[in-house]
Swiss-Prot record:
Membrane topology: Multi-pass membrane protein
Cysteines engaged in disulfide bonds, as pairs: 180-329
Name of the coding gene: SLC36A1
Keywords (A to Z) from UniProt: Amino-acid transport, Cell membrane, Disulfide bond, Glycoprotein, Lysosome, Membrane, Symport, Transmembrane, Transmembrane helix, Transport
Organism: Homo sapiens
Protein's name according to its UniProt entry: Proton-coupled amino acid transporter 1
Residue numbers on the Extracellular membrane side: 73-78, 163-190, 237-257, 311-342, 394-397, 461-476
Record's function text: Electrogenic proton/amino acid symporter with selectivity for small apolar L-amino acids, their D-enantiomers and selected amino acid derivatives such as 4-aminobutanoate/GABA. May be involved in the efflux from the lysosomal compartment of neutral amino acids resulting from proteolysis. May play a role in specifying sites for exocytosis in neurons.
pH dependence: Optimum pH is 5.0-5.5.
Entry keyword annotation includes Magnesium: no
Transmembrane segments: 52-72, 79-99, 142-162, 191-211, 216-236, 258-278, 290-310, 343-363, 373-393, 398-418, 440-460
A single MF term (Gene Ontology): L-proline transmembrane transporter activity
Catalytic activity: glycine(in) + H(+)(in) = glycine(out) + H(+)(out); L-alanine(in) + H(+)(in) = L-alanine(out) + H(+)(out); D-alanine(in) + H(+)(in) = D-alanine(out) + H(+)(out); L-proline(out) + H(+)(out) = L-proline(in) + H(+)(in)
Basic and acidic residues: compositionally biased ranges: 1-15
Length: 476
């Protein structure tokens, strides 16, 4: 990869979710559209409305989904689904705000496509505040920063997820049964610490991210989608059977655990980075708002149903990933392995976004004959960094909550409403709209602060240190 190409290559905001890079727009930000309406979008692209819907659904289904039963536990069996619904509505509304602002700048600046970072930068340039206009370039940098934190945070979550699930499968191997209808107590064979499992995956993930060809990555994306879909169907098949009496479950959980719910929930819903690339790939982008709302309704129903059913099925024993609660029979052990394989291959796709932001900075400063070495070295360092962070925080639930609170809340809740104000304030906005935007941003900021504090507080409490056991051992 030459230095010149790295310098000139336009960055595309692929997503902070499980969507492959090849589904991003192929046109650069500097391509000009013909004067006139926004209908110029999508003329040279090829995705149908159904393909866009599938990409949208795929991009919102990942590890965050499997952590929602524990999130419902942290909110309560009634408060949890209500809160998930509210967060889903607000998150989708913020996606709509981003699309509206992007349309505005495409028409105004005669561009064919603007990504999240550019939209924020142009929004600050339109602000009535001179200080914001003078520092508009920081808008793109802030978005890039949170994208990097979010994506590398996802990669940290993947390390913990892989370690926990493989550790459980290996330790229960001798006790695996043919009875897939009940959780039976088994004698686990102790193996190495979960952090050593993370180190075991490190060299394989390093080799995986050395693949820089997007076509090759799309093959891994397809394989990941198939394995995760099969696993998800089997998880639903189990949790809908023989649901225990829910009368002992709290309707509303203690307020102290609610911030952990917020972090996990917003981690799951933070797919705002993918909406603009998906829209730009459509043949008829006028249908995108309908596709967006339809897709997110399906996603919200999926989130609420899995969160509630998982909590109802396993109660207080629910773990950071519902896969850790599945029985120790051959079928559900296979489910854990299948989903883990999907997550393993998805690591490279999540890694692609921060790599495209960070690596050009270093490669452009290296001698031409050292470019490939520098590229691979930076990739190795970044993967090692995610592994080290996962080792330092080997609790799946808290890693998810922390990433969601720190970065996902900024991208999904805090920035879009402020962007709407800076973009349209000079053109006239109703006081109600300004109040609505301010309220969403304030709630997002409160969730950011309180959720981050509570996750860090839980991490430093020795009494809350996790014991890595198969939750099926609780069913005696």
């Amino acid at each position: 990869m030459s230095t010149q190409r790295l310098r000139n290559e336009d960055y595309h905001d692929y997503s902070s979710t499980d969507v492959s890079p090849e589904e991003s727009p192929s046109e650069g930000l500097n391509n000009l559209s013909s004067p006139g309406s926004y209908q110029r979008f999508g003329q040279s692209n090829s995705t149908t409305w159904f393909q866009t819907l599938i990409h949208l659904l795929k991009g919102n289904i990942g590890t965050g989904l499997l952590g929602l039963p524990l999130a419902v536990k942290n909110a309560g069996i009634v408060m949890g689904p209500i809160s998930l619904l509210i967060i889903g509505i607000v998150a989708v509304h913020c996606m709509g705000i981003l699309v509206k602002c992007a349309h505005h700048f495409c028409r105004r600046l005669n561009k064919s496509f603007v990504d999240y970072g550019d939209t924020v930068m142009y929004g600050l340039e339109s602000s009535p505040c001179s200080w914001l206009r003078n520092h508009a370039h920081w808008g793109r940098r802030v978005v890039d920063f949170f994208l990097i934190v979010t994506q590398l945070g996802f990669c940290c979550v993947y390390f913990v997820f892989l370690a926990d699930n493989f550790k459980q499968v290996i330790e229960a191997a001798n006790g695996t049964t043919n009875n897939c209808h009940n959780n039976e107590t088994v004698i686990l064979t102790p193996t190495m610490d979960s952090r050593l499992y993370m180190l075991s995956f490190l060299p394989f993930l390093v080799l995986l991210v050395f693949i820089r060809n997007l076509r090759a990555l799309s093959i891994f994306s397809l394989l990941a989608n198939i394995t995760m879909l099969v696993s998800l169907v089997m998880i639903y098949q189990f949790i809908v059977q023989r649901i225990p009496d829910p009368s002992h479950l709290p309707l509303v959980a203690p307020w102290k655990t609610y911030p952990l719910f917020f972090g996990t929930a917003i981690f799951s819903f933070e797919g705002i980075g993918m909406v603009l690339p998906l829209e730009n790939k459509m043949k008829d982008p006028r249908k995108f708002p309908l596709i967006l709302y339809l897709g997110m309704v399906i996603v919200t129903i999926l989130y609420i149903s899995l969160g509630c059913l998982g909590y109802l099925q396993f109660g207080a024993n629910i773990q950071g990933s519902i896969t850790l609660n599945l029985p120790n029979c051959w079928l559900y052990q296979s489910v854990k392995l299948l989903y883990s394989i999907g997550i393993f291959f998805t690591y490279a796709l999540q890694f692609y976004v921060p790599a495209e932001i960070i690596i050009p900075f270093f490669v452009s400063r290296a001698p031409e004959h050292c470019e490939l070495v520098v590229d691979l070295f930076v990739r190795t360092v970044l993967v090692c960094l995610t592994c080290i962070l996962a080792i330092l925080i080997p609790r799946l639930d808290l890693v998810i909550s922390l990433v969601g609170s720190v970065s996902s809340s900024a991208l999904a809740l805090i920035i879009p409403p402020l962007l709407e104000v800076t973009t349209f304030y000079s053109e006239g906005m109703s006081p109600l709209t300004i109040f609505k935007d301010a309220l969403i941003s304030i709630l997002g900021f409160v969730g950011f602060v309180v959720g981050t504090y509570e996750a860090l507080y839980e991490l430093i409490q020795p009494s809350n240190a996790p014991i890595f056991i198969n939750s099926t051992c609780a069913f005696i």
